[in-house]
Amino acid sequence: MATVNLTELVATTLRNRSKDYADNVSKGNALLTKLSSSGNVKSASGGRTIVQELEYAENATFKYYSGYETFDIAPTDVFDAAEYNWKQAAVVVSASGLEVNVMTTGKEATLNLLEKRISNSMKTMRNNVSIGIYSDGTGSSSKQITGLQAQIADDPTSGTVGGINRANWSFWRNQIGSAANISSTTLPGLMKAMWLACQRGPDVAKLIVADSIRFTDYWDSLTTIQRITREDKGMMGWETLAFLSAEVVYDGDSGLPAEHMYFLNTDYLFWRPHTSVNMVPLDRRDSLNQDAFLVPVVFAGNLTMSNAARQGVIFDSA
């Protein structure tokens, strides 16, 4: 009977399940779930940085005129771009010679071992990317994803995001709302104020993500009749409450900072994986000094933003 080639099975299965990796990561994070359902997963084909076009000023040539009065044709810089660094991540599926040649016998046992290793690696990638999405980007010596704590900051008047210095450019500052000892009594007022601060005409927050404390405060503030969940196919698999037209989501064990609630206009947030480096396996590597082999699964990309003023965060100042 032919010996089952575990190393080839690992490589082949990982190649076939590359899309499963990407989907698993997206579905394991509330923000990525929303971005995926709304078409804001935009792959990037390469370059020194990930360039995200943005709009930061109105066109100054607008004017009322009469008869033969001339138009204002002066050039106006309306669009600029933020530049985000590529962030890379990897998880490794490995097996030793003992597992391949001694302990694993038969195709069924081989496939079971393979499935467990792949499942574990998918969960590991999902959990760590999710933590990165909500991070301040300083983890792993600043190699972590540029997450919400960096882009929608408690202090948006300082720091550089996407190559733009917020101390110099007020258009690149998010909205903030804070109070000491926020409770279920005081939170609704802060949420109303934040909603209005982030709104521009019909342009409003689409998703509100909160840690367990702020989510519970909001939940407790609602009457039974108000505790409405909406049938939104874009957030399938997530239990949500409603605040006006936005879903309110608790994203547990995700790295959300304590006592924070983010108001996200997801029209201006993007998940930008590299076109060909999005949870894909590399070629098998054989260890030089061990009886083992490994297959890395790699990712390159980042979270980007095109409009900071339409985003906001509520946090406790105590």
Regions found by a protein language model. Give the residues of each.
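Flexible, glycine/threonine- and acidic-rich loop/arm segments that mediate assembly and lattice contacts
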Residues: 1-318
